[in-house]
């Protein structure tokens, strides 16, 4: 039995939380993600950039009522990577099942 390697991008608690949220809502504002993850703006910003650089999310910056707004959206690659991560975790919980 060989354990599948876990995706290092998703293995961070905050990045996994962001992707998990985006899986369910598809896209969300930075403030929503910050509130739901209880993270600081600085830490969340760094982790969002790592997810963006990996191609797991798209980030759009715009203005709404003269206020800056950052929208994060899950990509197909992000969805596939999340599903692979979950499958890898399941293989750890059921090592005799393939």
Question: What kind of region is each of these model predictions?
Answer:
Residues 2-3, 20, 79-98:
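Amphipathic alpha-helical dimerization/coiled-coil segments
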Residues 2-40, 62-65, 69-73:
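N-terminal helix-turn-helix DNA-binding core of bacterial DNA-binding proteins
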